[in-house]
Amino acid sequence: GRLGEPEDAHSYGWYAGEGGQAILSRFAIRDDAARDFAQMLWADMPSPLWPSEPMPGQEVQRLSRAGHWIVPLDVRGAPLTLMSFHATTPVFDGPEDRNGRRNHDEILFWRYYLDGAFGGAPKGPFVIAGNANLDPVDGEGRKTAIQVLLGDTRVQDPKPRSERVETTPGHKGDPKLDT
């Protein structure tokens, strides 16, 4: 990063909390059972996708741009686990593709979590909600992680659709899915 500029921290931002995330719920949040992986180091990921050359501060770099939260909800007496995140944009770096690699691992975190790598997986229904900053078909970024997550049999993609869409030249995916 550059001292005194937005790139000088664990995530891009001029001040603490810029680009953060929040959960607003009409259902009861079981905060006693919530888990926050925002402080988890990128190095603690199974097989992190590091750039080929070591990065300055690599040993203290957090995985999450904003956070990876496991938030149990009580929905009319039934448990629902909300898994929330906001991944880094996989662009705006150099040929080392640090942002693309970090975005890849931020998304792949959920697959490892479902496999039990970080101390348990949800026992009942769950929702993964947030901003992956990555399209599984179009745009820049490493598509493998989002494709693996969406292809996991434990995950159902509701594929929300928009009716009024414009297509862009070179767009391969269904533009109605770009909500």
PLM feature segments, named:
Residues 46-47, 84-87, 124:
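Short amphipathic alpha-helical segments, especially helix-boundary/capping motifs
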Residues 91-179:
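Metal-dependent phosphoesterases centered on the DNase I-like endonuclease/exonuclease/phosphatase
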Residues 33-37, 83, 92-97:
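A short secondary-structure junction signal
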